[in-house]
Amino acid sequence: MKEFRTLALGEIRLPAGQSPVILRARHSREICDGCALYQSDPNRLTPVKPMMKLLSAIATTFALCCGLSSAAPKRPNILFILLDDQSPYDLKCYNPQSPLETPHIDSLAREGMVFDGAYHMGSFSGAVCTPSRHMIMTGRGVWHLPISPEAKQKELCPLDIAQQTIPALFNRAGYATMRTCKQGKSYEAANKLFTVRHDATKRGGTAETGSAWHGDRVMDYLAQRETRKDTQPFLIYYGFSHPHDVRDGTPELLAKYGAINHTDKSSPPAANPKQPKLPPNYLPAHSFNHGHPGLRDEVSVSGVWARRDERTIRNELGREFACSENVDIQIGRALAKLQAMGELENTIIFYTAGQGMAIGRHGLQGKQNLYQHTWRVPFIVKGPGVKPGSRVEGNIYLLDVLATLCDLANIPAPETNEGTSFKPVLTGEKQSIRDTLYGVYCGGSKPGMRSVRKGDWKLIQYDVMNGSIRETQPFNFKENPDELLAEHRAPVVVALTGAQPAGHQLNLAADPEHAAKLAEMEALLLAEMRRLDDPWRLWNQPDDGLTPPGQNSGR
């Protein structure tokens, strides 16, 4: 009976002048049949096959060993999932009380890392998604984009940087790149560089007109890779048109959330107990004109228009949840396919949205504000090296995605990149990559609104309507995480939401106890505006204009 002994490399000791021949086995390195066998005397190797077979085995082994020593580690696949308009508070991983059912997104959160501090930097346009998607593609800050108001200043905004965007970088690195997403409101020069591209705006309630269309494009692409036996790593930009309005859900999911695709502008939709409850920071109107009169998202969205009554808002939340669950179904299809192909374990998955959404919170409907429900975005990462069930602050911007994807794929980030890789957060080395966050919305009247956050404190300031409205809103999130205002204490509002704000849960601008903190936050905001080349100044700031851009601006 031949005796096989499994050995570690370097374990064999041979007489002088003899060398071991080692074949790679399924689970370990062995001296095996066809080369030589250890028998009872571990100091002597006894040939057991004819010389020709032995020489053949030696040659095969040598080639195999050489190939193994030079083989590069398998590069990760990347699945980047991007929704259009989703507040993090819709998801159970951010709001356990949410009735929205997204089992596949929930599983990504359980098996990956949830970011509590992920933000889009803001917008100078009512179409917030346009600069947001430019920032994702380019890794550049909001004031340094090719479409920025400062684009005429070439030193701030290089115009032709499509070749330094995600698809171009990954194409050159040998990745297969594929994209499906809504049509328009993004960086077209970059979008057309994906090797495979299927863009169309799909916000209907059928398989052909809704999110299943995007899902089918990804499923077809994966099936084709499987048929061709492709080994090239892939980057899939898996974008959805929902839950952006018009939120026409499928009949089954609308019924689940008690909603209808309401089209009668003259009356509110019918009440239904299945509809989601009003959020705790709901208001029937915003506290003041927030500076963008006639804004489409606030007055023209089908099913809502300018209404903020309970029935309208709860129905619209139900529609949004129906659309979001349909997106989750499509994500589940892709994950199952990757699992069946044996690719899931080597795939890094990012889940996020281009921006958040209000839908009744603070009396607003759209995405043109800087409250947490809209300035923040959901952000989940699952993949090799990411600790399951982990949660971090992160303090990332969407513009950090490019640098991070490059870092994870071992691709040098381009010189045009301004973002910071958060790979050290994903690997557990850090909890966050910055301590200060800046936000802007000035798509209406100028200078518009600005925000800054550091630690538990956040400041929003408004300078709108030709200076007729100037408001300051400092919040302490440790005490007031929902950014509740005095208006939230109104009995009619409390009766609708069931949420009774505590005495300290309000705008702290007039509180003398926090005057020093307010001054500190105002100074911090000005410093960020200067550092990031914000071209405007608020009423209480020096009119110093632009400062030269700093190295690695956007960090």
Model segments located where?
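Extracytoplasmic
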Residues: 1-45
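Bacterial N-terminal signal peptides
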Residues: 56-67
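Loop/turn elements at helix/coil->beta-strand transitions in domains of secreted/extracellular proteins
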Residues: 74-79, 111-116, 172-178, 229-236, ...
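Active-site-proximal cap/lid insertion segments
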Residues: 83-99, 107, 123, 201-212, ...
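Short, solvent-exposed turn/loop segments enriched in Gly/Ser/Thr/Pro and often Arg
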Residues: 94-98, 114-137, 179-190, 239-244, ...
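Short, structured active-site-proximal loop/turn typified by the sulfatase FGly-forming signature C/S-X-P-X-R
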Residues: 95-133, 139-140, 171-178, 262-275, ...
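Polar, surface-exposed loop/tail segments
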Residues: 102-103, 136, 182, 345-350, ...
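Catalytic-site neighborhoods of secreted/periplasmic enzymes
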Residues: 131-234, 246-254, 258, 429, ...
